C-alpha cells in the first residue's frame, strides 16, 4: 500500500516554489521520495530554497526561469530533461494577486495577473508535456482556486485566470490522456498564507469565513500536501480532468 503513494525516483518540477505554498508542496512531496526541481524567477531564491530542502534530507535542484517568457521556459525544460532527468510531474503553482474595484482595475495589472496565472500554465505545460507525450507517461497538477468557481469583490482578473486554468486542465486532459498523461487541478479554499495575510488579520473577514465554511476555520497549508501526493502518485493513474477542492466544504455550502 505504501508503494501506491511513493514518489521515489520521480522528478517533480514546481513553478514558483521558492516560498509560500509552492515551497510547502516541495517539502511535502520531497518527503515522499521525489527529487524536487525548485523554480523561481531569481536564482538566489531558488538556490536558498534548495539549501533548505537539503537540510531536511530532500533531494532538490534549482531551475530559475521566468514562467511568462517562452524562450526561458523552453531552454530551462530542455536543460532539465537533458542534465537533471525526465520531468515526471509538473506542478503549475506560480501565481500572483492584485486587488482593485473592477471599474478601476489598471490594464497593466490585469495583464500581469493573466500572464502569470493563466498564460504561464499554458506555456510551461506545453514545453513539459511534449516530453511526456514522447515517454507516454506524466502527470500535471494545476493549482486552481475557489475562484475557479466563485467570484469575489476586487479580484475579478484573478477569478478569470483561475477559471481559465480549470478549463485548461480539462482541455489538456482530453488531448493528453491518450498518452497516459494525467492532468488534474487542486483548488485550495482559504488558507493562512502570505498571500492571504491581510484577510487573516481582518477580524470581520475571518468571522465571515468561519461562518461560511462548514469546517468553521481557516485551512492549514499542510492540509494541501495529501492532495498533491495523491495526484503525483500512481494512486491517481485513472483520475483525469478532475478538480480536487481542499476547502473545508465551502463550495458545497449555501
UniProtKB/Swiss-Prot annotation:
GO BP annotations, alphabetical order: L-idonate catabolic process
Residues reported in the UniProt entry to bind substrate: 145
Keywords: Carbohydrate metabolism, NAD, NADP, Oxidoreductase
Catalytic activity, EC: 1.1.1.69
Catalytic activity, reaction form: D-gluconate + NAD(+) = 5-dehydro-D-gluconate + NADH + H(+); D-gluconate + NADP(+) = 5-dehydro-D-gluconate + NADPH + H(+)
Coiled-coil regions listed: none
SUPFAM superfamilies for the chain: NAD(P)-binding Rossmann-fold domains
Pathway(s) per entry: Carbohydrate acid metabolism; L-idonate degradation
Superkingdom of the source species: Bacteria
Active-site residues, as the UniProt record annotates them: 158 (proton acceptor)
Cell membrane listed as a keyword: no
Induction comment: Is up-regulated by L-idonate (15-fold) and by 5-ketogluconate (80-fold). Seems to be catabolite repressed. Is probably under the control of the positive regulator IdnR. Is part of the idnDOTR operon.
Residues reported to bind NADP(+): 13-37
N-terminal signal peptide: none
Any matching Pfam family: adh_short
GO molecular function term, any single one: protein homodimerization activity
Function text: Catalyzes the reduction of 5-keto-D-gluconate to D-gluconate, using either NADH or NADPH. Is likely involved in an L-idonate degradation pathway that allows E.coli to utilize L-idonate as the sole carbon and energy source. Is also able to catalyze the reverse reaction in vitro, but the D-gluconate oxidation by the enzyme can only proceed with NAD.
Family (UniProt): Belongs to the short-chain dehydrogenases/reductases (SDR) family.
Protein name, UniProt field: 5-keto-D-gluconate 5-reductase
Organism: Escherichia coli (strain K12)
Taxonomic lineage: Bacteria, Pseudomonadati, Pseudomonadota, Gammaproteobacteria, Enterobacterales
